[in-house]
Amino acid sequence: MSTLNELIHYCNEYNPIGALLLTGEWGCGKTYLIEKDLTRALEKTHVIVKVSLFGITDANALRSLIRQKWFEVCTPILGQLHKAKEKSSGFLAAFNAALHAVNPLAGSAANVMVSMNMMDVLPIKAEVEDPKTLEKKRVVLVYDDLERVKMDPVQLLGVINDFCENQNFNTILVSESDAVLRHLMKEDATTYHMLREKTISQSLRYIPDFAEILHSILQERIWPSDDYAEYLSEHKALILDVFASDYDQRAKMLLAVEDGKYHNLRALTKGMESFFRIYYHTKEAGVALPDSHLYSFLAYYLAAKSGIRKGGELVLEFTESDLTQFYPGFSQDALTNIEREWIKTGIWDTNLFLEEIGVRSEAGQTDKNN
C-alpha cells in the first residue's frame, strides 16, 4: 500500500487508538504530501488542520494554538462566521461582528464574550458538519516542525495524546525521523518509550515518487516565461538525475547513509527559479547553454542551500570534489565564478558573467542588478 493510501486508511479510523508518525528525509516532500495529495484525496470527507510546533514552549501555548488553528480552518464550515471573518481581523472580531449582525443589542454581550477569549470557551470537535452538504467531516490534526519544538517532550506527547485518545482526533505527527523524538527524550528513555507507545500507534516512512512530484512542480508552478517553462520540461530527466539519482536504492533499503546529498524539494524549486537568470542572459547573448551547465548549477545550488551529509551530519561547507562524488555529472568548468559567488552570497554582476562565458559587452549596456 502506498504512503498516501496508508494515510487515508488511518484518517478513516473513527476512534483512533493513537497518532500516526510520518517520517522522511528533511525536505523530501512530506508537507507537500499532506497539504496537496492527502487534502485533495480527503476533501469530501475530512478537514486537515495543520499545527506548526515551531517555537512552542509549553502545554498551554500548544493547546491554545491547536484551538486557534481549528477555528481558522473549521469556522467557515460551521456557518455564517466565515463571511464575518473575511471582513474582520481575526476570529474574535469575526465572532463579535457576526453576533452583532444577528442582534444589534447584543454588542455589549459580544464584548464580554470576546474578553473571555471565545477560542478558550467554545468547544472544538473531531467532527464538523459541512453547511452546504450537511455531511459530517472528520478533523485531522497534523503536527509539523517537531524538530523545532522547545517544550518539554513529556508535556508535548501528553497534549498530543489527549487530543487523539480522549477527544478522538485523527492525528498525524510529521518528523524527519523517530530519532528526533528519542533525542527530545534523551534524558529519560524509559518515560519516552512508555509515552511513545501510548501516543503513537503507527509509524510510516515516506518514500516519495520524485518523478511524479517534479512533474507536478513543473506543471503547476508559474515560471518567469513560457519558453523557460518549456526548457525545464524538456530537461526533466536531467533535473531528476541531479536531484534524486541515488534515492531509489536508498529508499528501498531504508538506508540511513553517512555521506550523501539531501533531497530538498524547496531548494530544488528555488534552484530552478534562480537558473532562469543564466538561461535569460545566455539566450540574449546568443550563447549556447549546454546541459552540463544546468546540471552543475543545480548541483552547486542544492549543496549550498540544503547541505550535504558527511559522517551522518548536515554540513553546508563542501569542496567541489564532494560535488563530483555526490553529483557525478558536476563539471567545474561548466559553472562560472560569478554564479558560485551569487549562490553563496547573493552578489551578482551581469558584466562579469558575460565576460566569463566569453561575451564582451559595451560599458553600461547591462545592468548589474538585472
List each model region and its residues:
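P-loop NTPase nucleotide-binding core
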Residues: 18-19, 24-25, 31-135, 202
